[in-house]
């Protein structure tokens, strides 16, 4: 459960991401594909090379979903319900992959926002991404 301080930290950090959200989402996906090659199996139709339009496009989708989650931090299950259905029933993404992408997002944010990425913000973002992952995997049960 996110504390009030966590919510404040997450919103402040995401505000700093600003217009770079899609770019950071794509970078996190690239990191995931390089670090955890098995994740590529969900994207057989994508050009997974550095800077590909498809990875950038999906990175923007990831960032948009996170922006939605930040904006509805007190009601993520409702806000992300359609996305949860999509990943559970149509795409059938293994839930572990959300943890892998979350890790890569944290690394990407730390690389781009070193001054803002304090231990407290790191912990809050980690809890937030874990909450998003829990919501996205809730329909698997």
Swiss-Prot record:
One of its GO terms (molecular function) is oxygen binding. The modification Phosphotyrosine is found at residue 24. InterPro entries: Globin, Globin-like_sf, Globin/Proto, Hemoglobin_a-typ, Hemoglobin_oxygen_transport, Hemoglobin_pi. Keywords: Acetylation, Heme, Iron, Metal-binding, Oxygen transport, Phosphoprotein, Transport. The modification N6-acetyllysine is found at residue 16. Heterotetramer of two alpha chains and two beta chains. This is Hemoglobin subunit alpha-1/2. It comes from Macaca speciosa (Stump-tail macaque).
């Amino acid at each position: 459960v996110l504390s009030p301080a966590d919510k404040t930290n997450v919103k402040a950090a995401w505000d700093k991401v600003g217009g770079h959200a899609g770019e950071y989402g794509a970078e996190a996906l690239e990191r995931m594909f390089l670090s955890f090659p098995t994740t590529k199996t969900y994207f057989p139709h994508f050009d997974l090379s550095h800077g590909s339009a498809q990875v950038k496009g999906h990175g923007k989708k990831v960032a948009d979903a996170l922006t939605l989650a930040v904006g509805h931090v007190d009601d993520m299950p409702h806000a992300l319900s359609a996305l949860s259905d999509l990943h559970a029933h149509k795409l059938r993404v293994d839930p572990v992959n959300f943890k892998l992408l979350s890790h890569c997002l944290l690394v990407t944010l730390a690389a781009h926002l070193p001054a803002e990425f304090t231990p407290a913000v790191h912990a809050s973002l980690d809890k937030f991404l874990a909450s998003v992952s829990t919501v996205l995997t809730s329909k698997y049960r």
